[in-house]
Regions:
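RNA substrate-binding interface of SAM-dependent RNA methyltransferases
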Residues: 2-105
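Generic structural signal for helix capping and beta-alpha/helix-loop junctions
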Residues: 50-51, 113, 168
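Short amphipathic alpha-helical segments
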Residues: 30, 55, 117-119, 147-150
Length: 170
């Protein structure tokens, strides 16, 4: 006999928009994101990403990375499997015009705030926590100025975890 449990969906599904780093680091990022409960991972092919994929190879990478998430969920015992998509450019993702209640972007720019501050401001303004969020993480060398401008124009708020420059996998 097996015991079954009903586990509610996360209250604020998070989409991780992660620039693809060199080597197999993306697999570790997907694994950790799965363990932390991210709802979806969208690998990004930014201008500074050193990976050139045609549609067929991009689809294969998406399938391979989905398998990484499956293995991670088996290992950690999480109840929800994130969807890992095939890689897209930031422009392609923005063209989808998806709406998130709290879109944020990791930033090295002045004026960036800790994510907690944005969550608190949202709570104060709407009397509840956000029901969806996305987090943009750039590549080594960060997003280009044009990419940051496009992402910010779509409503993403700049966040920081402090004064240190963190590695992409952190």
């Amino acid at each position: 006999l097996r015991e079954t449990k009903t586990v509610p969906a996360p209250p604020c599904p998070i989409t991780l928009l992660q620039a693809v780093p060199k080597g197999k680091i993306i697999e570790s990022i997907i694994q950790k994101a799965t363990e932390l409960g991210v709802a979806r991972v969208v690998p990004l092919l930014t201008e500074r990403v050193v990976m050139d994929l045609d549609d067929k190879h991009a689809a294969r990478k998406g399938e391979k990375w989905q398998q990484v998430a499956i293995e991670a969920i088996k290992q950690c015992g999480a109840a929800w499997l994130p969807r890992v998509e095939a890689p897209v450019t930031p422009k392609e993702f923005l063209a989808r015009a998806e709406k998130f209640e709290l879109p944020i972007i990791a930033s090295l720019q002045p004026g960036a705030q800790h994510p907690r501050q944005y969550f608190e401001k949202f709570q104060a303004q709407y009397g509840r926590k956000p029901q969806s969020a996305c987090l943009w993480i750039g590549p080594e060398g960060d997003f280009t100025a044009a990419e940051v401008a496009a992402i910010a124009a779509a409503g993403a708020l700049p966040i920081t975890l402090g004064k240190l420059v963190l590695r992409v996998e952190t």
